[in-house]
Amino acid sequence: MNMEIFGNSISNILIFVVITLLGIFIGKIVDKIVRNYLKKIIDKTKTKFDDIILESIDLPIIVLVVTLFFYFGLRFLILPDYILKLIDEAVKVVVILSATYFAVKFIDGIFEHYLIPLTEKTETELDEHIIKPLKKVVKILTILLGILTALSSVGYDITALLAGLGVGGLALALAMQDTIKNFIAGILILIDKPFSLGHWVKVKGAEGIVEEIGIRSTRIRTFDYTLITIPNSELLDSAIENLTVRDRRRVLMTIGLTYNTPVEKIKRAKEIIKEIVENHPATLPPYRVHFREYGDWSLNLRVEYFVRNMGFDYYLNAVDEINLKIKEEFEKEGIEMAFPTYTVYLEKDN
């Protein structure tokens, strides 16, 4: 056993190997204890917080145990100072990165088990649209912080690195200014709420149902099932008609009577229309029925009323019932509706 390798006896090298292998073995034991024994205890609790911690410490604790045993085993070896320094720095990096991994997993668990379910219970869509991108941002910042801390621990000057990142970030921001503008516009839309998911809107020549409000763009499904995607920045600068939030829908139509209709029957026609419209359960005021004009082939009655906004089918059914009732009453009263007609006069030659 007097044989030496790089100044270390075989016995010392064997001690290092045994300690390292012992660290791997104990690390696996700790892993099993965490996964089996502690999990059974934690599963009995009502809170999710301890489950989050359990899920977060699983891998880091194994890495830390193995690293500590490896680091301890090195003490039995004779190594140059620069090698020991490198190993010390490597251990620091491993510990910091393990802590970073724990932090990222912990943040992920807090969002998944607490914040996301909480926002699903709220009435505001802002929470639901912001929380998932926020989770990604927080995790990325945590990873960057861990990497910078690890670099700083081994002697790197992170000030110069941060300055370089600042210049790079500025260039990236300029390249992504449209994306950033759309992102901010998306946040403002969610805060201001000119419309919500499922609303019927008219904007920039598009009309349909809002299917998705994203961070970059909004998607509208038209009534012929075409999907239109509009950047949020354009939406923010446009006039938006929200047809869902109105409490009533306007009906404006013209009913033409034949020119040979007597005045009394014109008055009766107006009475019939107004009575039918006012008595229908789906209608709302104001109700307007007027003899408006002498048309090319008809005496035109202008009819205006409103229908409760309880869906498009409800609106169509109400108009259908009213129109059929008007036709039915006109037939009973002998009131004739006009259709395009022309009178042709023929002049005889002498």
Curated annotation (Swiss-Prot):
GO cellular component terms attached to this protein's record: plasma membrane
Superkingdom of the organism of origin: Archaea
PROSITE patterns xrefs: UPF0003
UniProt main location, coarse: membrane
Membrane topology qualifier: Multi-pass membrane protein
Ranges annotated as spanning the membrane: 10-30, 59-79, 91-111, 130-150, 154-174
GO biological process: monoatomic ion transmembrane transport
Keyword Cell membrane part of the UniProt annotation: yes
Gene3D superfamilies documented for this protein: 1.10.287.1260, 2.30.30.60, 3.30.70.100
Subcellular location, record wording: Cell membrane
Family: Belongs to the MscS (TC 1.A.23) family.
Purpose: Small-conductance mechanosensitive channel that opens in response to stretch forces in the membrane lipid bilayer. Exhibits a sixfold preference for cations over anions. Non-rectifying.
Name of the protein in question: Small-conductance mechanosensitive channel MscMJ
Organism this protein belongs to: Methanocaldococcus jannaschii (strain ATCC 43067 / DSM 2661 / JAL-1 / JCM 10045 / NBRC 100440)
